[in-house]
Amino acid sequence: MKKRIPRIYIKYFLQINQVISLSKSYTHYIKKVLRMKKKDKLEIFNNTNYIFFSEILEINNHTIEIIILKKQIKNLESPLLIHLGQVISKNEKMNFSIQKSVELGVNTITPLFSEYCNFQNKLICFPKKKIHWENIVISSCEQCHRNNIPEIKNPEYILPWCKRTYENETKIVFSPSATFTINELPEKINCVRLLIGSEGGFSFLEIEKIIQYGFIPIKLGPRILRTETAVIAAITALQIKFGDLS
Protein backbone atom coordinates (compact mmCIF):
# COMPACT_ATOMS: atom_id res chain seq x y z
CA MET A 1 0.00 0.00 0.00
CA LYS A 2 1.28 3.44 -0.95
CA LYS A 3 2.29 5.52 2.07
CA ARG A 4 0.10 8.59 2.63
CA ILE A 5 1.98 11.87 2.33
CA PRO A 6 1.02 14.27 5.17
CA ARG A 7 -0.48 17.64 4.19
CA ILE A 8 0.10 20.97 5.91
CA TYR A 9 -1.11 24.51 5.28
CA ILE A 10 1.30 27.43 4.81
CA LYS A 11 -0.40 30.79 4.38
CA TYR A 12 2.05 32.63 2.14
CA PHE A 13 3.31 32.61 -1.45
CA LEU A 14 5.34 29.54 -2.42
CA GLN A 15 7.71 28.83 -5.30
CA ILE A 16 9.93 26.01 -6.53
CA ASN A 17 13.27 25.60 -4.65
CA GLN A 18 12.08 27.82 -1.82
CA VAL A 19 13.36 26.76 1.62
CA ILE A 20 10.90 27.21 4.49
CA SER A 21 11.29 26.98 8.27
CA LEU A 22 8.12 25.51 9.72
CA SER A 23 6.30 26.91 12.75
CA LYS A 24 6.78 25.42 16.22
CA SER A 25 3.37 23.74 16.12
CA TYR A 26 4.10 22.01 12.81
CA THR A 27 7.62 21.12 13.98
CA HIS A 28 6.17 19.36 17.03
CA TYR A 29 3.46 17.66 14.96
CA ILE A 30 5.84 16.40 12.26
CA LYS A 31 8.55 15.29 14.67
CA LYS A 32 6.62 13.95 17.67
CA VAL A 33 3.30 12.85 16.19
CA LEU A 34 4.16 11.78 12.63
CA ARG A 35 7.76 10.87 13.56
CA MET A 36 9.02 11.99 10.17
CA LYS A 37 12.70 12.11 9.25
CA LYS A 38 15.06 13.92 6.93
CA LYS A 39 14.17 13.39 3.23
CA ASP A 40 10.57 12.46 4.05
CA LYS A 41 7.97 14.09 1.80
CA LEU A 42 5.26 16.63 2.67
CA GLU A 43 2.41 18.06 0.62
CA ILE A 44 1.83 21.79 1.11
CA PHE A 45 -1.20 23.91 0.21
CA ASN A 46 -1.58 27.66 0.52
CA ASN A 47 -5.17 28.63 -0.34
CA THR A 48 -4.65 28.44 -4.11
CA ASN A 49 -5.49 25.83 -6.73
CA TYR A 50 -1.97 24.40 -6.40
CA ILE A 51 -0.41 21.73 -4.24
CA PHE A 52 3.32 21.87 -3.54
CA PHE A 53 5.46 18.77 -3.06
CA SER A 54 8.29 19.24 -0.58
CA GLU A 55 11.04 17.35 1.22
CA ILE A 56 12.44 17.71 4.73
CA LEU A 57 15.96 19.17 4.55
CA GLU A 58 16.80 19.52 8.23
CA ILE A 59 15.10 18.43 11.42
CA ASN A 60 16.13 19.27 14.98
CA ASN A 61 14.61 20.01 18.37
CA HIS A 62 13.34 23.48 17.55
CA THR A 63 12.70 23.73 13.82
CA ILE A 64 12.23 21.84 10.59
CA GLU A 65 13.35 23.12 7.20
CA ILE A 66 11.70 21.93 4.01
CA ILE A 67 12.34 22.64 0.33
CA ILE A 68 9.63 23.01 -2.32
CA LEU A 69 10.39 20.56 -5.15
CA LYS A 70 7.48 20.97 -7.56
CA LYS A 71 3.88 22.15 -7.81
CA GLN A 72 0.74 20.83 -9.44
CA ILE A 73 -2.65 22.34 -10.25
CA LYS A 74 -5.38 20.59 -8.27
CA ASN A 75 -8.79 22.23 -8.06
CA LEU A 76 -11.25 20.24 -5.93
CA GLU A 77 -13.81 23.03 -5.53
CA SER A 78 -17.47 22.39 -6.29
CA PRO A 79 -19.19 24.41 -9.05
CA LEU A 80 -21.85 25.19 -6.43
CA LEU A 81 -20.94 28.12 -4.16
CA ILE A 82 -22.45 27.74 -0.68
CA HIS A 83 -22.50 30.46 1.97
CA LEU A 84 -23.60 28.76 5.19
CA GLY A 85 -25.28 30.78 7.91
CA GLN A 86 -25.05 28.54 10.97
CA VAL A 87 -26.79 29.65 14.16
CA ILE A 88 -24.23 29.15 16.93
CA SER A 89 -24.73 25.96 18.91
CA LYS A 90 -22.87 24.38 21.82
CA ASN A 91 -19.12 23.97 21.41
CA GLU A 92 -18.77 20.40 20.15
CA LYS A 93 -21.84 20.62 17.93
CA MET A 94 -20.61 23.87 16.35
CA ASN A 95 -17.13 22.43 15.84
CA PHE A 96 -18.63 19.34 14.19
CA SER A 97 -20.90 21.41 11.93
CA ILE A 98 -17.97 23.54 10.73
CA GLN A 99 -15.73 20.52 10.17
CA LYS A 100 -18.27 18.57 8.12
CA SER A 101 -19.51 21.56 6.12
CA VAL A 102 -15.91 22.23 5.01
CA GLU A 103 -15.44 18.58 4.02
CA LEU A 104 -18.66 18.78 1.98
CA GLY A 105 -17.56 21.86 0.05
CA VAL A 106 -18.95 25.00 1.74
CA ASN A 107 -17.11 28.16 0.66
CA THR A 108 -18.08 30.64 3.40
CA ILE A 109 -19.42 30.21 6.94
CA THR A 110 -21.06 32.96 8.99
CA PRO A 111 -21.81 32.08 12.65
CA LEU A 112 -25.17 33.63 13.58
CA PHE A 113 -26.94 34.77 16.75
CA SER A 114 -30.67 34.10 16.93
CA GLU A 115 -33.40 34.70 19.52
CA TYR A 116 -33.12 31.16 20.87
CA CYS A 117 -29.31 31.14 20.78
CA ASN A 118 -27.63 31.27 24.21
CA PHE A 119 -24.62 33.32 23.13
CA GLN A 120 -25.96 36.82 22.40
CA ASN A 121 -24.27 38.37 25.45
CA LYS A 122 -20.91 36.72 24.90
CA LEU A 123 -19.57 38.71 21.95
CA ILE A 124 -16.38 39.38 23.89
CA CYS A 125 -15.49 35.67 23.62
CA PHE A 126 -15.82 35.45 19.86
CA PRO A 127 -12.44 36.72 18.61
CA LYS A 128 -10.91 33.64 20.28
CA LYS A 129 -13.79 31.47 19.07
CA LYS A 130 -13.23 32.64 15.50
CA ILE A 131 -9.53 31.69 15.64
CA HIS A 132 -10.54 28.28 16.99
CA TRP A 133 -13.07 27.80 14.17
CA GLU A 134 -10.51 28.90 11.56
CA ASN A 135 -8.12 26.24 12.86
CA ILE A 136 -10.88 23.64 12.49
CA VAL A 137 -11.36 24.78 8.87
CA ILE A 138 -7.64 24.39 8.13
CA SER A 139 -7.49 20.94 9.77
CA SER A 140 -10.53 19.86 7.75
CA CYS A 141 -8.87 21.04 4.52
CA GLU A 142 -5.71 19.12 5.42
CA GLN A 143 -7.80 15.99 5.92
CA CYS A 144 -10.15 16.23 2.91
CA HIS A 145 -7.52 17.56 0.45
CA ARG A 146 -9.21 20.87 -0.25
CA ASN A 147 -6.62 23.45 -1.25
CA ASN A 148 -8.80 26.56 -0.99
CA ILE A 149 -9.59 27.61 2.58
CA PRO A 150 -13.25 28.47 3.26
CA GLU A 151 -13.72 31.81 5.02
CA ILE A 152 -15.14 32.14 8.52
CA LYS A 153 -16.91 35.50 8.75
CA ASN A 154 -17.33 37.46 11.98
CA PRO A 155 -20.41 36.36 13.98
CA GLU A 156 -23.50 38.51 13.42
CA TYR A 157 -27.21 38.60 14.11
CA ILE A 158 -29.42 36.43 11.96
CA LEU A 159 -31.83 38.96 10.42
CA PRO A 160 -29.27 41.39 8.89
CA TRP A 161 -27.47 38.36 7.41
CA CYS A 162 -30.75 37.02 5.99
CA LYS A 163 -31.72 40.41 4.56
CA ARG A 164 -28.62 40.66 2.34
CA THR A 165 -29.07 39.52 -1.23
CA TYR A 166 -26.45 39.02 -3.93
CA GLU A 167 -26.90 38.54 -7.66
CA ASN A 168 -27.73 34.97 -8.76
CA GLU A 169 -27.93 33.80 -5.13
CA THR A 170 -30.69 31.38 -4.10
CA LYS A 171 -31.69 31.61 -0.44
CA ILE A 172 -32.66 28.32 1.22
CA VAL A 173 -33.72 27.38 4.73
CA PHE A 174 -34.46 23.76 5.57
CA SER A 175 -37.56 23.39 7.72
CA PRO A 176 -39.47 20.30 8.92
CA SER A 177 -42.75 22.19 8.39
CA ALA A 178 -41.98 23.14 4.77
CA THR A 179 -44.00 21.69 1.90
CA PHE A 180 -41.45 22.14 -0.92
CA THR A 181 -38.71 19.57 -1.52
CA ILE A 182 -35.28 20.07 -3.05
CA ASN A 183 -36.52 18.51 -6.31
CA GLU A 184 -38.90 21.45 -6.75
CA LEU A 185 -36.06 23.98 -6.89
CA PRO A 186 -34.92 25.31 -10.30
CA GLU A 187 -32.88 22.87 -12.40
CA LYS A 188 -29.71 24.97 -12.26
CA ILE A 189 -28.44 26.81 -9.19
CA ASN A 190 -24.86 28.11 -8.91
CA CYS A 191 -24.88 30.00 -5.62
CA VAL A 192 -26.75 29.27 -2.38
CA ARG A 193 -27.19 31.18 0.88
CA LEU A 194 -28.05 28.33 3.25
CA LEU A 195 -29.51 28.96 6.71
CA ILE A 196 -29.29 26.30 9.45
CA GLY A 197 -30.83 26.93 12.88
CA SER A 198 -29.76 25.85 16.35
CA GLU A 199 -31.37 23.28 18.64
CA GLY A 200 -34.12 25.73 19.62
CA GLY A 201 -35.12 26.55 16.06
CA PHE A 202 -36.32 30.03 15.05
CA SER A 203 -38.76 32.39 16.75
CA PHE A 204 -42.04 33.30 15.04
CA LEU A 205 -40.67 36.76 14.15
CA GLU A 206 -37.48 35.26 12.72
CA ILE A 207 -39.44 32.81 10.56
CA GLU A 208 -41.65 35.64 9.31
CA LYS A 209 -38.63 37.81 8.41
CA ILE A 210 -36.63 34.92 6.91
CA ILE A 211 -39.47 34.23 4.46
CA GLN A 212 -39.96 37.97 3.83
CA TYR A 213 -36.25 38.26 2.94
CA GLY A 214 -36.61 35.68 0.18
CA PHE A 215 -35.61 32.37 1.76
CA ILE A 216 -37.28 29.29 0.26
CA PRO A 217 -38.35 26.80 2.98
CA ILE A 218 -37.35 23.28 1.92
CA LYS A 219 -38.19 20.01 3.63
CA LEU A 220 -35.30 17.55 4.07
CA GLY A 221 -37.47 14.58 4.96
CA PRO A 222 -40.04 13.26 7.42
CA ARG A 223 -37.75 13.21 10.46
CA ILE A 224 -36.63 16.02 12.79
CA LEU A 225 -32.84 16.32 12.54
CA ARG A 226 -30.35 17.62 15.08
CA THR A 227 -28.64 20.83 13.97
CA GLU A 228 -25.32 19.05 13.33
CA THR A 229 -27.12 16.35 11.31
CA ALA A 230 -29.19 18.90 9.39
CA VAL A 231 -26.13 20.76 8.12
CA ILE A 232 -24.63 17.53 6.72
CA ALA A 233 -27.91 16.40 5.16
CA ALA A 234 -28.63 19.83 3.66
CA ILE A 235 -25.21 20.38 2.09
CA THR A 236 -25.08 16.81 0.80
CA ALA A 237 -28.52 17.16 -0.82
CA LEU A 238 -27.48 20.44 -2.48
CA GLN A 239 -24.16 19.02 -3.71
CA ILE A 240 -25.88 15.95 -5.17
CA LYS A 241 -28.42 18.03 -7.09
CA PHE A 242 -26.34 21.08 -8.05
CA GLY A 243 -22.70 20.43 -7.15
CA ASP A 244 -20.01 17.78 -7.46
CA LEU A 245 -21.54 14.82 -5.60
CA SER A 246 -23.82 13.92 -8.52
UniProtKB/Swiss-Prot annotation:
It catalyses: uridine(1498) in 16S rRNA + S-adenosyl-L-methionine = N(3)-methyluridine(1498) in 16S rRNA + S-adenosyl-L-homocysteine + H(+). One of its GO terms (molecular function) is rRNA (uridine-N3-)-methyltransferase activity. Keywords: Cytoplasm, Methyltransferase, rRNA processing, S-adenosyl-L-methionine, Transferase. The keyword Chloroplast does not apply. Transmembrane segments: none annotated. SUPFAM superfamilies: alpha/beta knot, PUA domain-like. Its EC number is 2.1.1.193. One of its GO terms (cellular component) is cytoplasm. The keyword Transferase applies. It is found in: Cytoplasm. Its main location: cytoplasm. GO terms for biological process: rRNA base methylation. Specifically methylates the N3 position of the uracil ring of uridine 1498 (m3U1498) in 16S rRNA. Acts on the fully assembled 30S ribosomal subunit. Homodimer. Belongs to the RNA methyltransferase RsmE family. This is Ribosomal RNA small subunit methyltransferase E. The lineage of its organism: Bacteria, Pseudomonadati, Pseudomonadota, Gammaproteobacteria, Enterobacterales.
